[in-house]
Amino acid sequence: MAMQKIFAREILDSRGNPTVEVDLHTAKGRFRAAVPSGASTGIYEALELRDGDKSRYLGKGVLKAVEHINKTLGPALLEKKLSVVDQEKVDKFMIELDGTENKSKFGANAILGVSLAVCKAGAAEKGVPLYRHIADLAGNPDLVLPVPAFNVINGGSHAGNKLAMQEFMILPVGASSFKEAMRIGAEVYHHLKGVIKAKYGKDATNVGDEGGFAPNILENNEALELLKTAIQAAGYPDKVVIGMDVAASEFYRNGKYDLDFKSPDDPARHISGEKLGELYKSFIKNYPVVSIEDPFDQDDWATWTSFLSGVDIQIVGDDLTVTNPKRIAQAVEKKACNCLLLKVNQIGSVTESIQACKLAQSNGWGVMVSHRSGETEDTFIADLVVGLCTGQIKTGAPCRSERLAKYNQLMRIEEALGDKAVFAGRKFRNPKAK
């Protein structure tokens, strides 16, 4: 079925920054998609095109990207008369029309907006749910509901506290369904609020960009201690484990790491990658930490490799791999990590996101689907994670509607699948393992 009209507009994301929204019309109706945006971005990500006009939105407008869709990409696609079910052909056409390595001509935010809308239209054209259409595109006969990784304590570039590490997450792996995982996550979250309020006062329960709390603590193990206490208080020590996103590239300084990077710089306190690795090993030993994302800088390959060989938990590449097949291949070859963080806007199209996922999975890696800190009410990634059978998703705390939009959509999907619903649970790293 051909596209009839493609129209893009500038909307606001959850941080009050502009982003791109696309409406695509076919005979079946209107299909709308909005593009997310990150705060801590890897230097190898596809280019997010911003206007740079300081008199509008402090330079963060996206009118150029919107215009590229309305004046160039849209008309070219309509003229080409491609079918919305041919996701790969549509994406390939846009990528070739852009012609740059990192989508810098039109902007990854322009190309992705159209790509997401096409995917939604393709599902409607086939008369199947979006998650089923995505599973078909990926060649997956199965569907799996993911374990949610709730980011309940925020630090790093997401919060105004002194905490260096960016995210402390809870994963209810012992739940029997996604719906139960949501309940357990929400209950631990509420207990955590009480624990933080009692220890640090009411101000400490203000939430960060992703709905997690941002108490003004400096020591990272203090955050882990708070989680441990809340998990115990909620009564789930056997069902909930911990994940972290360190985002270490944010505090990498001249070959070393600064765990107090929000204070005035003092090279005397910078530590080596090896020393930082020892700290992580102490976390793994003392807390139920099962996953660490971006433990080192995006170009500190040697430290990644030596660390991975000495631990048996999930080590996730985000800034390291940026959902990019070339970076993933490099990480596989160097044995740098064993899980890919999948963010659709890092690579900039649905087809390339699926390819990145398949590449990681074919090399025995886990895959975790992820939101960005600047989100919208769009729920595409909820369907994506089910269709790609990755078994794990992180899309914030059970707080703030742009986060809950995804979690609630996952509950609806589980309900629609009925007794065919499979929840990843403790097999979140490899949900297809029998």
Swiss-Prot record:
Cofactor(s) listed in the protein's UniProt record: Mg(2+)
EC code: 4.2.1.11
Induction: Thyroid hormones up-regulate expression during hindleg muscle development and down-regulate during cardiac muscle development. Decrease in ENO3 levels with aortic stenosis.
First-listed, main subcellular location of the protein, grouped into a coarse class: cytoplasm
Catalyses which reaction(s): (2R)-2-phosphoglycerate = phosphoenolpyruvate + H2O
GO cellular component: cytosol; membrane; phosphopyruvate hydratase complex
Tissue expression notes: The alpha/alpha homodimer is expressed in embryo and in most adult tissues. The alpha/beta heterodimer and the beta/beta homodimer are found in striated muscle, and the alpha/gamma heterodimer and the gamma/gamma homodimer in neurons.
Entry-annotated residues carrying Phosphotyrosine: Y236
Binding site for Mg(2+): D245, E293, D318
Phosphothreonine: residues bearing it: T72, T205, T229
Residues recorded with modification N-acetylalanine: A2
Taxonomy, superkingdom: Eukaryota
Keywords on record: Acetylation, Cytoplasm, Glycolysis, Lyase, Magnesium, Metal-binding, Phosphoprotein
Record note on cofactor: Mg(2+) is required for catalysis and for stabilizing the dimer.
Database matches in InterPro entries: Enolase (IPR000941), Enolase-like_C_sf (IPR036849), Enolase-like_N (IPR029017), Enolase_C (IPR020810), Enolase_CS (IPR020809), Enolase_N (IPR020811)
Similarity remark: Belongs to the enolase family.
Subunit structure: Mammalian enolase is composed of 3 isozyme subunits, alpha, beta and gamma, which can form homodimers or heterodimers which are cell-type and development-specific. Interacts with PNKD.
PANTHER family noted in UniProt: BETA-ENOLASE (PTHR11902:SF5), ENOLASE (PTHR11902)
Role, per record: Glycolytic enzyme that catalyzes the conversion of 2-phosphoglycerate to phosphoenolpyruvate. Appears to have a function in striated muscle development and regeneration.
Annotated protein name in UniProt: Beta-enolase
Taxonomic path: Eukaryota, Metazoa, Chordata, Craniata, Vertebrata
Gene: Eno3
